[in-house]
């Protein structure tokens, strides 16, 4: 019986209880039961010595005898006595015996040691345990210190190290100890610079398998993390978490100094340097100092002209990654920044901030010289130059001076005729970005400037400003020649031509000359017969925009021109002028 028992153990077939009792009764060294007392299944055989598996039912004696004969050739009788060994170094007897047995067994015979549920052949006891637990879902191993259960002994051992602080894995380089061998292996790679995990796609190596896994997503293009708010997908959960802040507006990172909140820890760290006033990173080219090395590197690209961030869609390159990210939204049509007031969306947070000022009417930028306030810092800077009377930027073409280089560049387009800003909707091009922005409102039907007096809305701020003067009867622009006042400077300029008699705008078709370019444009329509201005209400067309504007008042009933004498209102300025003669006694 004992001999049979030894043979079964050697083959990796766990003994049943009666055999175990007989073995103990014969006075042999007992098994180390401590390791197995929590497991309901038969005890574990050394993973380095044999393949631990329950025996298949109905194995013929002849086959078992054949294996036993091969066992006899290995020539080691006491292999079964070291059943509870956990380390291959402790188990040299097993290791030697296992190698001989492995050479003796054929592939067919090895298949005896299989999982009873699926025909998977395992090479280690630990693997077979994991495999069987997947079928049962059993968690039989309990921690004595904490009320926690584990499927496998290895998991329990790892858990126990946390509270016992058993740092059994020591670094030979500096003596630092770790709970797990995997942590030690990773730590060692810091000293050696070893990167054992290589990407098969591009050859790039990494120190951690988890980093390699993350890297592989670049090649597969897989984006498993999806935003429920806008549907945008990402290849990392951390990027999705950062993205979500756009929708929530959350700023969880707060400055202890001033209480200001930020959406990312990196932005907070950059901000903190403002309080510390530390700027240790200096540009050798221009002397500009920065509070971070990364900011200095970005700044240097201004001097070098380097543009490392390229758009795969159109090939356009950028100096900064943030600029590329913003640019990509043009192709994607993505506009994550939404105005809560009117619902309009933008692809940049800075544009949304500027847009909000339309609704609030806020003018946070004040001139120290005269107290005048502005909605933009750029407009304030331009204004300041009026007080300083500094105009260092001169046009070589016409001699006109400007207080900013950007204004001079814009002015030069008058001479060159350059129109770099094109409308994607209709193809119309403009010399200035502001003109394109205003033009786009025509397609969108947007009229953000609303008159509080009469409720009329306007597409452009300039039109709104002019309109307000109708209610205020304000005419700040006065003619020095005749004293007549006007609501806009452009109308005053046109008026002055009456006194000079100048007619510099000539029609090429008939030779007729005009004082104003707008009148020439309207005159040309006589020759073409074109009527581009159409009433949406009744379909009637006009050759002049002013005629269409006057016509629309028939439908709206609007009477913006008021008589100051009697309060009567009229649809056109000419009608109110005619009416005023009744009060003055002039012949109408």
Curated annotation (Swiss-Prot):
Start and end residues of each KRAB domain: 1-43
Domain of life assignment: Eukaryota
SUPFAM superfamilies the UniProt entry points to: beta-beta-alpha zinc fingers
Zinc finger (C2H2-type): 169-191, 197-219, 225-247, 253-275, 281-303, 309-331, 337-359, 365-387, 393-415, 421-443, 449-471, 477-499, 505-527, 533-555, 561-583
GO BP terms: regulation of DNA-templated transcription
Example of a GO MF term: RNA polymerase II cis-regulatory region sequence-specific DNA binding
Native source species: Homo sapiens (Human)
Keyword field contains Nucleus: yes
GO CC terms, sorted: nucleus
Cellular localisation: Nucleus
Gene expressing this chain: ZNF676
Function text: May be involved in transcriptional regulation.
Family: Belongs to the krueppel C2H2-type zinc-finger protein family.
Listed name of the protein: Zinc finger protein 676
Keyword Cell cycle: no
Keywords noted in UniProt: DNA-binding, Metal-binding, Nucleus, Repeat, Transcription, Transcription regulation, Zinc, Zinc-finger
